[in-house]
Amino acid sequence: GDWLSTVRGDTTVIVSEHRPVPLDQWMMLGRKIYPLFEPESGGQVNAELERRIQRLEAGETDDGRADYKSGKGFRARARHKGGGRSEFHGKGRGRSGAARQQDRYRPLGRPEVLKVLQSQDMLPAITFIFSRAGCDGALYQCLRSRMVLTSQEEAQHIKDIVDAGVEGIPEEDLQVLDFKRWREALSRGFAAHHAGMLPAFRHIVEDLFVRGLVRAVFATETLALGINMPARTVVLEKLIKFNGEAHVDLTPGQYTQLTGRAGRRGIDTLGNAVVQWAPAMDPRQVAGLASTRTYPLISTFAPGYNMAINLLGMLGFEESLRLLEKSFAQFQADGSVVEETREIERAEHR
């Protein structure tokens, strides 16, 4: 508000926390989904959820483990077929104690997660995975499974839309892009969405999802930025992401932005945010992310050489300088200088 006042003049800030479609928060343990909060508790973490997690960590329950041992889950079948290798560990021999402790819990494969969501009437869903390779890997997991989320009529309708959307792309290019497998995935009701895809492919996925023909999308966080693709449910597999330098926790702002895709206005009465539990994940931490509504905004604006040259070419030096001085980054920098000056003055008077 203060920044806008300096740029535009007198500004009145109006704060609204009303959400057109209410959002329910959930955690998934094995094949079960538990409410994150106690009903009508004002934000108290679900005691039953905490008890289940404690039992799971102590090895007193087989939630998420029985299917893995018996070979029912998709990841279990992949492990048995692959000679003892799993997605999370190497060969069975020589593993550390920490790795053996994680055997108490095995996350469901992506197809199994979608089946659980389907049984709870939580589709369509967007699963956020913080890498392009992870999104493609999730898609191939579903392809290798027997999962189908569409009827025969819907599958044919999807194929017709896809074929019309790629008309004009040479056949040899489609072969390089693995078009047939991508088309099959769409016809079965699931897709990947990330910036590494051909723009035409991304637009087709967005169109089919908005039409309700594709029921599951595995996407990077770029889908939460400016693309109108709301879903009934948003799934977060992890609460950490790689920021280019290190793996860091999601901030409340990022969590709110991602889960903000849940709940379609005029269609759903409730949206769902589902976090998949993993060892060492504290439900109170998740509750903190879900309940935080105010968080600092920090500008990431950083002028570069190309921007400077373009501004000078279009506006000249004086006008370019005035424009940059109006930026939120400059406003925050000025504020920090004022605060540091006050600190120095207070220190001098001591």
List each model region and its residues:
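Long, largely alpha-helical accessory region at the distal end of helicase-like NTP-driven motors
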Residues: M281-R350
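Ser/Thr-glycine-rich phosphate-binding loops at phosphate-binding pockets of nucleotides
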Residues: G1, G212, F218-L223
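Conserved C-terminal RecA-like helicase domain
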Residues: K69-G97, Y105, P111, R132-A216, ...
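Conserved segment of the helicase C-terminal RecA-like domain
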Residues: D24-Q25, A216, T222, M229-T294
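Active-site glycine-centered loops adjacent to acidic/histidine catalytic or metal-binding residues
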Residues: S131, F190, G226, G260
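Conserved ATPase-coupling elements of RecA-like P-loop NTPase cores
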Residues: G1, F201, I227-P230, E245
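Conserved interdomain linker/interface between the two RecA-like ATPase lobes of SF2 helicase motors
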Residues: G1-Q141, A191, W277-M281
